Swiss-Prot record:
UniProt motif 'HIGH' region: location: 29-39
Gene3D superfamilies according to UniProt: Cysteine-tRNA ligase, C-terminal anti-codon recognition domain, HUPs
Major subcellular location class: cytoplasm
Annotated protein name in UniProt: Cysteine--tRNA ligase
Species annotation: Prochlorococcus marinus (strain MIT 9215)
Gene: cysS
Length: 489
């Protein structure tokens, strides 16, 4: 059973899909710049939701759009002396690079607003025909007061709304509107702007109508889950509901899920406040992609995530331990690849281990099924990683270490379970997560120096070299007194 907090009902509800395929729409980025940690949090969280649904045997169709026409894109194009298309296409490529680096599965479909202009115009025409929209000198607006249910998602009282709280609309447009709260469906083109032809003349779509049209075209009138950041609840998602339900006469989405913001010094991380850190900058600073992913999972997805160097370092250390456990097969040099046919293990012991691991998998599913409790899921991951890490400490440092057959079976099955469950969280083993300034030749030289120190019983010097290499992202593995291997962390 999967339970999710529905922003629409303001309570946790049991998830019941409409049909065999779970239809999900996630609001995508406006492609005018590189993505920051706030974007990373949102798309990591929803990637985990998608992965967990698939793990739970649901079929999923996941759609995420690109807003590729917008005031910010036009402004950036002017700054760079380029076109709107050049700016958006360049940043779409960079978006994919960032998301791929974080292990985020690509959506099944990623529609662009500019490819749906005909659908958008048709959608606006329906709203006009039904009396929900009106045109003024080439602009088209949605009449908020025509919709008695407006405000049901955000609990906004339209009588009390601030006139300036209109998303991406300029104040000088208010004079064209019947009411200050009405919002733009179509914007008349300015002399120096790119435009599209429409029944109302040359112009471009408003922000909110783009998503309504793309949801309908990609997934139909009613979808299972609509996703986004909590900053989109109003006005964007509220306006989506108003548009779609007025035009289609059906509920837009059964479940509305929103992730909390990333905060810096108590303020939302955003480009407008200039307090953001891009994903690229974080990774370049030495934070591995999986450490970043792990960091996002440490806090409930609906709560604010406080961005501090200390929290990132703590997440990196925690992930390092899990990553070592995920490297178990590599570090044991194939000794645990399989159980030989001639090696006999009691069925009673096999059943015991199988039951214990099935209980861990059950608790893992219960955690994620409880409104994506990633912290609870991580606790299970730690339970699985601990015996593998403990064994490696012995295996790497004790010469001639012998492996008990039952323990071998347990560790193999434990590793398989760990590998399976970390994939649900999108956590993948990292061999090289950051560039190291130390070369392989330098590593080998220091290892030889350390071996000489150990032979001379200069253990302080040996520890000093180990610590030095560890600071440079190198983990030493003592296979015997004379053989030491290493991995990059």
């Amino acid at each position: 059973m999967i339970k999710l907090f529905n922003t629409l009902s303001k309570r946790v509800e049991v998830f019941k899909p409409i049909d065999d395929v779970v239809k999900i729409y996630c609001c995508g980025v406006t492609v005018y710049d590189l993505c920051h940690l706030g974007h990373a949090r949102s798309y990591i969280v929803w990637d985990i939701l998608r992965r967990f649904l698939i793990y739970s045997d649901f079929k999923v169709k996941y759609v995420q759009n690109f807003t590729d026409i917008d005031d910010k894109i036009l402004k950036r194009a002017k700054e760079e002396s380029s076109s709107m298309k050049e700016v958006s296409e360049k940043n779409i490529i960079e978006f994919h690079k960032d998301m791929d680096s974080l292990g985020i599965m690509r959506p099944d479909s990623m529609p662009k607003a500019t490819n749906h202009i005909c659908n958008i115009c048709s959608f606006i025409t329906i709203l006009e025909d039904k009396g929900y929209a009106y045109s003024r000198d080439g602009d088209v607006y949605y009449s908020v007061f025509k919709n008695k249910n407006y405000g049901k998602l955000s609990n906004q009282n339209i009588q009390e709304q601030n006139i300036n709280q209109q998303g991406r609309m300029a104040n000088d447009e208010n004079s064209k509107k019947l009411n200050p709260q009405d919002f733009a469906l179509w914007k008349k083109a300015k002399d120096d702007e790119p435009f599209f032809d429409s029944p109302w003349g040359k112009g471009r779509p408003g922000w909110h109508i783009e998503c309504s049209a793309m949801v309908k075209d990609e997934l139909g009138d009613t979808i299972d889950i609509h996703l986004g950041g909590s900053d989109l609840i109003f006005p964007h998602h509220e306006n989506e509901i108003a548009q779609s339900e007025a035009a289609n006469g059906k509920k837009l989405a059964n479940y509305w899920l929103h992730n909390g913001m990333v905060n810096v010094n108590g303020q939302k991380m955003s480009k407008s406040l200039k307090n953001f850190t891009t994903i690229r900058e974080l990774i370049k600073s030495g934070i591995s992609p999986m450490s970043l992913r792990y960091f996002v999972m440490t806090v409930n997805y609906r709560k604010p995530l406080d961005f501090t160097e200390e929290a990132l370092r703590s997440a990196s250390e925690a992930w390092k331990n899990i990553n070592i456990a995920l490297s178990f097969m590599d570090l044991t040099k194939g000794a645990f690849r399989y159980i030989d046919k001639n090696e006999s293990i009691e069925e009673e012991y096999k059943e015991k281990i199988s039951f214990e691991l099935s209980q861990k998998k059950l608790k893992f599913s219960e955690a994620l099924g409880n409104d994506l409790n990633t912290a609870g899921a991580i606790a299970i991951i730690y339970d699985l990683a601990k015996p593998l890490k403990n064994f490696l400490n012995q295996f790497q440092r004790v010469e001639g270490f012998k492996i008990d057959l039952n323990e071998k079976f347990f560790l193999i099955e434990n590793f398989k379970t760990l590998e399976k469950l970390t994939k649900v969280l999108g956590l993948e083993k990292e061999v090289l997560v950051k560039e190291s300034k130390i070369t392989e030749e330098e590593i080998s030289s220091l290892i030889n120096e350390r071996l000489k120190a150990k032979k001379g019983k200069n253990y302080a010097k040996a520890d000093e070299i180990r610590n030095l290499l560890n600071e440079k992202g190198i983990e030493l593995i003592d296979q015997s007194k004379e053989i030491t291997t290493w991995i990059r962390l």
